[in-house]
Regions:
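A conserved mid-protein helix/loop that constitutes part of the nucleotide-sugar donor-binding site
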Residues: 23-28, 195, 199-221, 242, ...
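Short His-centered aromatic/hydrophobic patch
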Residues: 98-104, 122
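A short helix/loop element that forms part of the nucleotide-sugar donor recognition site in Leloir-type
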Residues: 176-190, 243-246, 363-365
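Conserved acidic donor-binding segment of nucleotide-sugar-dependent glycosyltransferases
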Residues: 313-314, 318-325, 334-339
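Short hydrophobic beta-strand element within catalytic cores of glycosyltransferases
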Residues: 43, 298-301, 311
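Aromatic "clamp/platform" in nucleotide-sugar-dependent glycosyltransferases that forms part
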Residues: 262, 281
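A conserved, positively charged/aromatic
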Residues: 118-148, 157-158
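Nucleotide-activated donor-binding/catalytic signature segment of Leloir-type glycosyltransferases, i.e.
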Residues: 241-261
Length: 380
């Protein structure tokens, strides 16, 4: 499947420089690509932790601006498309994989001009009236959706055949139930007799953290031996992060709540927890769900977005009403008071990940999408 003894050159387009779920998923992909078939190249917009991570795996990206399209600037748009065309020619690109909505349209236009197939990777539930990817969904050759909920965004019947649903995967060796969380407990002065409930993710207003903190207040009324970990940092809105800290003081739970900030030792943090919570009602395919299940941790998660496709209610965790702190608290208390249920859900979660959500499966299915298009393109 190699062209003239050489690998296929894949150009990845990515606008963000932070390290969030989409960035981790993309890094997992390019690290594990079959390098006898594919050579990854990147076009990104700015320096940051994601770019540092690329350089750590010996990938040097090109830089290009992806302007917004709601208030289009014709000069900037032309410059972006011209810049992409130059990269396509210089690197002899065989296929483009656009990882974010902001780069999708520009990548598609540049791909069409240069007769190169393009894949859009859709990782979010678009909110609001202006869903540009749905509007322009006739442009890409394939659309990868990371959940059925994301797939449902695309309403045009004619594009159904080009959509592939490929759910995120997790490395079972990295997220191992035998990981040691004792150092985390020691770092934050958590007694071995205390129970730990944690949530992991970007600290943004739409992620449901206020509901998590209110549920913490309710839980502490019944179970005073519980500590709460909030793992992550704000992408932009640091004032919201500050307001959450102030909220814990107002609720009288500040001595019981720990904000860790950004952490890279996620397996150890999960290992320190007894229950992992996803309060967000807008996540399409949260990585923390797979990672927690892989480590045999039971989940309490909002019954919304792509979460019900991953968490089996009453089997690997408990699904709760989005935005309902009382329901969340009730479910967390139920698990904390039943050790056998904690273990039962945890083991079922690990089993489910091994059967359905491995990183190997995710990579293979993505490579198959590439090969579908490259085989078709070579015969045209």
């Amino acid at each position: 499947m190699v062209k003239d003894g050489k690998t296929y050159n894949i150009l990845y387009l990515h606008n963000e420089s932070i390290m969030g779920g989409a960035e981790i998923s993309l890094l997992n992909l390019v690290k594990r690509l079959d390098k006898e078939l594919f050579t990854p190249h990147f076009a990104c917009s700015k320096e940051g932790p994601f770019i540092d991570a690329l350089r750590n795996i010996k990938i040097t990206p090109d830089f290009i601006k992806f302007p917004g399209i709601r208030w289009p600037n014709p000069v900037r748009i032309c410059n972006t498309i011209r810049g992409l065309a130059n990269i396509i020619k210089e690197k002899q690109i065989d296929l483009i994989h656009s990882n974010q909505p902001r780069s999708n349209l520009f990548g598609a236009i540049a791909a069409k001009i240069n007769s190169v197939p393009i894949v859009w990777h859709e990782r979010c539930l678009e909110r609001g009236r202006f869903d540009s990817d749905n509007i322009f969904s006739f442009l890409p050759d394939r659309i990868i959706c990371n959940s059925g909920a994301v797939r449902n965004r695309f309403t045009k019947e004619k594009i159904d055949t080009k959509i592939r649903t490929i759910i995120n995967g997790v490395d079972l060796n990295e997220f191992d139930p035998e990981s040691d969380g004792s150092k985390i407990r020691k770092e934050f002065n958590i007694d071995e007799k205390e129970l730990v409930v944690g949530t992991i993710g970007r600290i943004d207003p739409e992620k449901g953290y206020e509901y998590f903190l209110e549920s913490a207040r309710i839980i502490l009324q019944d179970l005073p031996n519980v500590r709460f970990l909030v793992v992550g940092e704000a992408s932009n809105n640091h004032s919201f992060e500050k307001s959450l800290s102030e909220m814990t003081a107002e609720k009288g739970i500040d001595k019981k709540t720990i904000f860790t900030g950004f952490r890279s030792d996620i397996p150890q943090l999960i290992a320190s927890m007894d229950v992992v919570v996803l309060p967000s009602g807008i996540d399409a395919c949260s990585r923390v769900l797979f990672e927690s299940m892989a480590m045999q941790k039971p989940l309490v998660a909002a019954n919304a977005g792509g979460t019900p496709e991953i968490v089996q209610d009453g089997i690997t965790g408990l699904l709760v009403k989005p935005g309902d702190s009382s329901d969340m608290a009730k479910s967390i208390i139920r698990l904390l008071q039943n050790i056998s249920l904690l273990e039962q859900y945890g083991k079922a979660g690990r089993k489910r990940v091994k059967e359905m959500f491995t990183i190997e499966r995710n990579i293979k299915e993505t490579e198959n999408v590439y090969l579908e298009l490259l085989d078709t393109n070579s015969t045209n």
